[in-house]
Curated annotation (Swiss-Prot):
Stated family: Belongs to the TRAFAC class translation factor GTPase superfamily. Classic translation factor GTPase family. CysN/NodQ subfamily.
InterPro entries in the cross-refs: CysN_GTP-bd, CysN_II, CysN_NoDQ_III, EFTu-like_2, G_TR_CS, GTP-eEF1A_C, P-loop_NTPase, Small_GTP-bd
Ligand binding (GTP): 39-46, 118-122, 173-176
Single GO molecular function: GTPase activity
Originating species: Photorhabdus laumondii subsp. laumondii (strain DSM 15139 / CIP 105565 / TT01)
Chain segments carrying region G5: 211-213
GO biological process, one term: sulfate assimilation
Pathway: Sulfur metabolism; hydrogen sulfide biosynthesis; sulfite from sulfate: step 1/3
Keyword Heme on entry: no
HAMAP family: Sulf_adenylyltr_sub1
Name this polypeptide is given: Sulfate adenylyltransferase subunit 1
Amino acid sequence: MSALAQNETIAHQIKQQGGVEAYLHAQQEKGLLRFLTCGSVDDGKSTLIGRLLHDTRQIYEDQLSTLQNDSKRIGTQGEKLDLALLVDGLAAEREQGITIDVAYRYFSTEKRKFIIADTPGHEQYTRNMATGASTCDLSILLIDARKGVQEQTRRHSFISTLLGIRHLVVAVNKMDLMEYRQEVFNQIKQDYMNFAGQLPTNLDVHFVPISALDGDNIVTISRNMDWYEGPTLLDILETVDVKKEASKQLLRFPVQYVSRPDLDFRGYSGTLSSGILRKGQKVKVMPSGICSQVERIVTFDGDLDFAVPGEAITVVLKDEIDISRGDLLISADDEMMVTRHALVDVVWMSEQPLVQGQNLDIKVAGKKSRGKVENIQYQVDITHLTQRVAVDLPLNAIGSVEFSFEEPLMLDSYQQNSDTGGIILVDRLTNVTVGAGLVREIQTDVYEGPKEFSEFELELNRLIRRHFPHWGARDLLGGK
């Protein structure tokens, strides 16, 4: 493919659409798929992304020229273009020939827009992989045809499903090195399905044999594998149905900001997480439980009659209510649990292990609070998907942890709602993110409000929390 042809792709699409504005409007109307590539070390993840960008004409002339020079200088593919260099951006990655950080790339076809997360294969960078997977709808699991299903393949499959990804594409790469033999592909497919029986049952799994280096079954059907009658990888990406039924879920609107541009306007800004919010709808403010009615739904482009999940809006209520960042708007007839305790699946990202009794700052749906590790139930053995007793969680470990919270929180399970069920764990001294939490189970007892304390008790509590924060004393007033 010539550089000129690649360079003219967008210009040709603009001409077809009838101008720049029409082209931009068409781009906005396209559906978006977020997916990640993951697998074991050197399975060809970066090469696959480079091939997708190359064969869908997303590489410009200057990029191609740089790629040709870099391929000759530090490439690993001989006379061929080393497409992995398109996405391995860090100097350390290029020198070692591996992926360390999560590299994001963007491209589009006539049917869909895509955001790709190229995630690390090395076990010590599993935390980076979990970060990349948290916003994706689909995982491409690369398997080296020479090696078959590896431990990292199982690890990444488990993390993907743990983070709510239900669409998996198992791409058996480097088929060219195995002479494109069908029995190799079939054996790997069988081995993976044997393992996948331990994963959630509602998965949509596709298998495709590919060669990322030569482009077999990436964008065009391979002539070297006539025995494969399925779609290409790009066909799967363009047609997979990843529509989340967020609009059919319960209403969840986390308040991120109170908007007061003047004395006559008071609105509550944020992104609608799930459900449909309509003008005139009765809503309940959590955790106070006060009900009101939606008077306006304000956006940059004007008022709306209703809002759908993913839209950034400002809600104006009929009544003057004390609402602050971290509060939640739900349907008036919804009974949402407010709790101080939850069972959380934790992906630990710090070199210092997570231990029982540890205090952490937490963030959930715009709300900042504090939590304490009451008990570590178990650590997951990713290789065999079994549970083992643990007194701590080391770096890159995944385990089930019982948390208590300083104040009552509004939580859903992560599988129901990733916004109100996802917790960011932050070290209280360094302010560094040390883990990701996914709410598995909410304690059934409902918080009934703060008990009465004397003025002396309240003043002593404030004094201790102000001057001795490392003691981890909770706010007796529940954060109010």
